[in-house]
């Protein structure tokens, strides 16, 4: 890698919710910047005013805040290379459009949409390039006086990049190696439109990356076909020596079948494709987000990092700091990565297990309050310790362990038929008497006394414990029985046993 300071950027357009593929691109830029002691820039590419969606920019910033991806400079972060919003850089772009016009590397074209459509009808596979430009209405074919007059009259025009034919354009890609494309297949791309006095993506992108001293462009594979054009633009400006290095990341693919992962795939298969819930201001449609679906941000980060990259060993669980140390663009795959949403759930489960019981309890407390439960923290911590290995999401803890906080009002019919025997009411009342006599209601003492009682009486252990579980839980699930009764306490345990006998006898 060159000696220049690493400066990378993530530059979304505020046209809607941030796709999870965009999050992965930002993550890889973040990991690369942190690993090399560089800067991560947040730029907003809002040159397409027709597609602007109110609230999208704020949504993107909030998404990264939740994920823990921090930017060093950019929109809402400040910095010395601003403004960082492209709509605020119009005068800068105009200046560089003029540089290309003055050097003969670009030209003004007046062709109307109707005229271009007519050409497409006339010539199959029509392309505005070296083979057709001299038959079109532009500053290469019209006298200068006429061009000046048309502009003075307010005639709308575009500025096109003049691409010379039959040149092999070499793009060195960190992930894909040498990519070579012949310039003859490229059209004379529009760089600027007089109608809104804004550049197109291609010009703004190159000018901004150069002026912001971006050293590496790490972006999605969908931009690979544009890379030769971008190389030619750097050369046209005389910036070839400071051109950034490119790395085009593999696509995120549908979980089933071929093609790029889309929002429709998430809707169809029941998983989010956005980091946060998104309320579309135009349609009113609400799309699910990873945060609201119960994913932990560190699990999402770890899951995404391994979609298209691997550390070279079998390690799967990695903190953000570990990812920074291990990340290597050369280990990114060229092939697309299938989006395995079940694996995402596995990561979330593993990160719940990694958290301390106190941390998980803190996340579970608001859910308990939503259900009207005011429980002491020490009880919640104990319950979480018993139950967190059974869930993939914090929100699932309620259904999994609500019996610790709310006594059953009904008893599962299937469990009742299978496990509630004819003598169960009598045995449970006996058990209640045994437990009531205990001064020490600790788990260990309960277990010792009850097991001795069962042995002394010659009762069937399974029958007693199954019936005991049904009285406390209402069904046949849950952890070790004496863990449950110890958490419930003596009074609540006795109350539940006796109530169940009343209902079930």
Swiss-Prot record:
PROSITE patterns: AA_TRNA_LIGASE_I. This is Glutamate--tRNA ligase. Its EC number is 6.1.1.17. It is found in: Cytoplasm. GO terms for cellular component: cytosol. A motif ('KMSKS' region) lies at residues 260-264. ATP binds at residue 263. Belongs to the class-I aminoacyl-tRNA synthetase family. Glutamate--tRNA ligase type 1 subfamily. Catalyzes the attachment of glutamate to tRNA(Glu) in a two-step reaction: glutamate is first activated by ATP to form Glu-AMP and then transferred to the acceptor end of tRNA(Glu). SUPFAM superfamilies: An anticodon-binding domain of class I aminoacyl-tRNA synthetases (SSF48163), Nucleotidylyl transferase (SSF52374). It catalyses: tRNA(Glu) + L-glutamate + ATP = L-glutamyl-tRNA(Glu) + AMP + diphosphate. GO terms for molecular function: ATP binding; glutamate-tRNA ligase activity; tRNA binding; zinc ion binding. It holds the Pfam family Anticodon_2. HAMAP family: Glu_tRNA_synth_type1. GO terms for biological process: glutamyl-tRNA aminoacylation. Its main location: cytoplasm. It is an enzyme of class 6 (ligase). It comes from Phocaeicola vulgatus (strain ATCC 8482 / DSM 1447 / JCM 5826 / CCUG 4940 / NBRC 14291 / NCTC 11154) (Bacteroides vulgatus). The gene is gltX. Monomer.
